[in-house]
Amino acid sequence: MTSDRPVAPLLTVKQVIPRVRDGAVGRDRLNERLTSATSRLTVVVAPAGWGKTVLLSSWAASLGPDAKVAWLSLDEEDDEPVRFWRYLIGALRTASDGVSAAVLEALMAPGLRPLDLAVPMLLNELAAASARRMSWSSTTST
């Protein structure tokens, strides 16, 4: 399901968790809230310059080297839908074995509305991966 049209490569630096600089202000209470969150998704919202990146990168570092974290840094160039989804899918693939290359291929498929094909595939793969993890954790905890 590959396309013949040329595709710009993804910038892998956008998927690298920024290193926390020495002297960065610690956010122990917020780090604890992130660590103890029970939902599968946490949204962090604050104005520019209020420490979101520092908070999330320090939290990700606190999870240890084996933690799987999908990180994506976006800029104004990433507001084109297919470009955005390519980056998001790429970031999710770094953190989850449950997201296949077929999703990226679907996004670039000729003759179709790519988001109509790729986004449902991605959501189905994430749901299946989540179900497998839940099934595995329930069998290991009994």
Regions found by a protein language model. Name each.
Residues 38, 50, 54-134:
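Conserved phosphate-binding/catalytic loops and adjacent sensor/switch elements of nucleotide-binding enzymes
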Residues 127, 139-142:
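Catalytic acidic motif of RecA-like/P-loop NTPases
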Residues 44:
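Hydrophobic anchor at the beta1->P-loop junction of P-loop NTPases
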Residues 2-33, 101-107:
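Conserved adenine-nucleotide phosphate-binding loops and their immediately adjacent elements
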Residues 32-41:
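Phosphate-binding P-loop
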Residues 47:
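P-loop (Walker A) phosphate-binding loop of NTP-binding proteins
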